[in-house]
A protein has these predicted regions:
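Active-site loop/oxyanion-hole signature of alpha/beta-hydrolase fold enzymes
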Residues: 35-38, 43-45, 83-126
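Gly/Ala-rich beta-loop-alpha elbow adjacent to hydrolase catalytic centers
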Residues: 127, 131, 135
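Flexible "cap/lid" loop of the alpha/beta hydrolase fold
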Residues: 136-140, 148-181
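Short, hydrophobic alpha-helix immediately C-terminal to the catalytic nucleophile
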Residues: 69, 108, 136-140
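Structural signature of beta-strand start/N-cap positions in the alpha/beta core
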Residues: 54, 80, 122-124, 147-148
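Conserved HGGG/HGGXW glycine-rich cap/lid loop of the alpha/beta-hydrolase fold
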Residues: 45-91
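Alpha/beta-hydrolase fold catalytic core
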Residues: 1-55, 76-79, 116-119
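Conserved catalytic-core motifs of eukaryotic protein kinase domains, centered on the activation segment
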Residues: 67-69, 92-98, 160-163
Length: 188
């Protein structure tokens, strides 16, 4: 059955699997990490078993914490879960500069806050695309804060990579589509 895209999310997910519908019904707590460079927004789901584990989901470029809403609740039996809006994305505030270190320092600050205010002992970062780069930074520069990382669809540069020698592809025009159906058909 083809999924029909409308202007009503409830109709759009009518044929979604039960686990998906159940997951998006669970409403996380919205949290803010105050930071002089710009506040960081994140969603938090508490474990159903008072777990000492914390999983932090970090999105990719141009995404936001809500992308993890159907996924995060799948881990609540054994973990507390956080989904972060990186600086300048989602509901987090904009900053004057952005970089992997800046993003990683935000994640480290959230971990420190959660460890201070809860029983969290084991921390796992799951990063998609850019989020994987951020997870890698935290793993290499802030090892004492985390236990493991999982990176998904993340490029890893070789140790001898020289950005001055990198040649990117041509820039493409941003495409505009008249409606959701046209967008969906683009990917069929």
């Amino acid at each position: 059955m083809l999924m029909q895209i409308t202007n009503n999310v409830n109709l759009d997910i009518e044929h979604a699997p039960k686990w998906f519908k159940d997951a998006i019904k669970l409403q996380p707590t919205d949290e803010v990490l105050e930071n002089p460079l710009g506040n960081i927004s994140y969603s938090k789901w508490d474990s159903i078993n008072n777990s000492e584990n914390l999983m932090i989901f970090v999105h990719g470029t141009g995404a936001h914490k809500k992308w993890w809403d159907p996924i995060a609740p799948q881990f609540l039996e054994n973990s507390n879960v956080i989904a972060v809006d990186l600086p300048g994305m989602g509901e987090s505030e904009f900053r004057d500069k952005y970089g992997i270190k800046d993003f990683g320092d935000c994640i480290a600050s959230i971990i420190e806050k959660e460890k201070l205010n809860s029983n969290v002992k084991n921390v796992y970062i799951i990063g998609h695309s850019l989020g994987g780069q951020v997870a890698g930074y935290v793993a290499s520069e802030k090892q004492d804060l985390i236990d493991n990382i999982i990176i998904i669809d993340t490029f890893i540069r070789p140790p001898n990579y020289n950005p001055a020698e990198h040649q990117g592809g041509p820039l493409r025009m941003i495409k505009h589509y008249p409606d959701k159906i046209t967008i969906l058909n683009r990917f069929r």
